[in-house]
Amino acid sequence: MEYVILILSLVGIVFGADYLVAGSVSIARKFKVSDFVIGAAIIGVGTSTPEMTVSFIGALNGNADVAIGNVVGSNIFNVFGILGITAMFFPVTFDRQNLKFEIPFCVGVSVLLTLFALNFFNGTAQCVGRVDGLILIAIFALFMWLSFARDKKQRLQVSAESVPAEESKTEEAGPMWKAVLKVIGGLAVLIFSCDLFVDNAVVIAKSFGVNDAFISLTLIACGTSLPELAASIAAALKKNTSMALGNVVGSNIFNIALILGLSSQVTPLTSTGITLVDYAVMIAAVVALYAFGRDCKIQRYEGVILFLCFIGYTWYLITNQIA
C-alpha cells in the first residue's frame, strides 16, 4: 500500500508544480516582476511550507535535531540536488544582479546560521537562541524589501523601446484570478502530495532503526524539498530557468532566516546531532553556486558536479550512520 501512495503522491507533485509555476509566471507578467524575484518570493516561500511545518513540530516536541537538520539538509539538497538535476537537463541562466546580491546574501545567512548554531559569539552549548532568531527574522524582512526594491528600480531603468514587449507579455498573462487560483491550488496539491510521500518514507526508515538526525538530514530534508524540485523542473521546462534559481535561493534564505527564526521563538534550538561538517557542506553548496555562476550560467557539466557532491554527502551520512 505504501508504494501505491508513493506513486500517487509523485503524480500529485508533478501536476501541483506545473500549476504553481504557470500561475506564478502569469503573476510575474501582470506586475512586470522578474522571474527570479517571483521564484524567490512566491515559489520559494510557498514551496518551503513543508520545511516550516516540520521544523515547527520539531521545535514544539523539543527535537532541535529535526528542526535544524531539516533546514540544513533541505538547503544542501536545494543546491546540490535540485539545481544539479535541473542544470543537467536545462542550463540555468540568470541576471548578473542576482550574482551580486541574492546569491551572496544566501552565502551570508548560511554562515550566520553556522555561527549562531555553534555559538561562536558566546562559546556555550550549540544553540540557536531567541535573540539569534529575532536577528534572523529581521534579516529575512530586509531581504524581501531589498529584493522588491531592487527589482522595481531595474524595471524603471528599462529603456522606452522595451515597453511594448512588456505590455504584450502582460496581455498574454490571462485573468489575474485564474493565475492566483493556479498558484493556491497548485501549491496545495504539491504540499499535500509531498506530505504523503515524506510520511511513508519516514515510516519505512524508522522500521530500520535509523536515528532522527540522519532522517532529518536525508529523508525529511529531501522529501520536504520535493516541492522545490518539482517547481524548479517545471519552471525549466517552461524556459524559466531564472525562476528555478530564484526558487532555490529564496527557499534557502526563507528556511534559515524565517523558519529557524520563528522556530527558535517557540523554544531555543539546542542541537548536538547536526555537526560542523553538515554546516560546512551547506555553506560550500552556496559558495559553489556562486563560483559556477560567475558567467551567469550554470552549465550541464556543472550540474553533474553539483549532483555528484550531493551523492557524496549522502554517502558520508550513510557510512556515518552505519558507523
Write out the residue ranges for each language-model feature.
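Hydrophobic alpha-helical segments, chiefly the membrane-spanning helices
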Residues: 1-323
